[in-house]
Structure formats: structure tokens, C-alpha cells
Design a protein with these regions (language model features):
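Short, surface-exposed, charged amphipathic helix/loop patches that serve as local interaction elements
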Residues: 2-5, 30-140
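Extended acidic low-complexity intrinsically disordered regions
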Residues: 1-25, 139
Length: 140
């Protein structure tokens, strides 16, 4: 079953169309600190949910941001090999976090951009239930 055209000319995707979309964008990035290239990918919705859940900490009505290892956590989800498979597991957070901050910043910036992560998105995550202002964003 393909796209359905309605009487007003709009084309709507079917379930099969949506699930069949090849929408995982990847970008090559040269990292001078390592004198090599890496491949950075867009996260799946599940990976983005995982990243956001690992970034926000809730205690009762209080919400705060967990910035510890944020660069490594995002890079773990977005660094892939040439075939698009993740290179790192969640358990590699500490090890990756010991690498060059400048190198991880480069990768983090590209991952942030291609995943559409804006300061407003993080601020919305950090807001607590009473509408108090969010803490400073880690995505500067």
C-alpha cells in the first residue's frame, strides 16, 4: 500500500511507508585531534528518549539536569561505523569521557545540530512541574 492521494491533493503515508523510510542521516566529520574521520548519525526516537531520560533527574517535584558525561553519552549514541552500527555501548561512557574534550566537543556539536537539539528543547526537559525556570542549558 503506497501513498494515498485525497480529493484535496494531499498525499498521506501508510504505516508501511513510514516504517520503510530511510531517514537515518549520517555525516562524516574530520577530528583533527585524532587526525581521522568519524561518522555521526541522527538518533532514532528511542535513542533520543534514552538520552533525554539520562539527562533529566527528577526527585519528587524537583527536576535538574544531569550534565555529568553528557558529551560522552550523546557521542555514544551518535558515533557509528561505516555501516551505520553503533561503535560504543552505554558502558563505554567513562572510557569515552577520558578522551580529548576538544574532540568530543566537535562530535557533540555535530550530533546536536543533526539531531535538531536546541537550547529550548533542553530547557523544556529541565522545567519542573510548577513551571519554574529551567537551569542553564548544556547545549551552548
Amino acid at each position: 500500500m503506497g501513498k494515498q492521494v485525497t480529493s484535496n491533493g494531499k498525499q498521506f503515508l501508510s504505516k508501511a511507508d513510514i516504517l520503510g523510510q530511510q531517514d537515518m542521516v549520517m555525516e562524516d566529520l574530520f577530528v583533527p585531534e585524532w587526525d581521522a574521520w568519524v561518522k555521526v548519525k541522527v538518533m532514532t526516537a528511542a535513542e533520543r528518549d534514552h538520552f533525554e531520560a539520562s539527562t533529566v533527574q527528577r526527585e519528587g517535584k524537583k527536576t535538574s539536569l544531569n550534565l555529568q558525561g553528557i558529551r560522552a553519552r550523546l557521542c555514544i549514541l551518535c558515533l557509528v561505523d561505516e555501516d551505520g552500527h553503533r561503535m560504543f555501548s552505554d558502558e563505554d561512557e567513562y572510557a569515552l569521557g577520558t578522551k580529548s574534550g576538544a574532540a568530543l566537543d566537535r562530535i557533540f556539536s555535530v550530533a546536536q545540530r543533526i539531531n535538531g537539539m536546541r537550547d529550548e528543547d533542553v530547557a523544556a526537559l529541565a522545567k519542573n512541574s510548577d513551571g519554574a525556570p529551567a537551569e542553564d542549558s548544556p547545549f551552548d
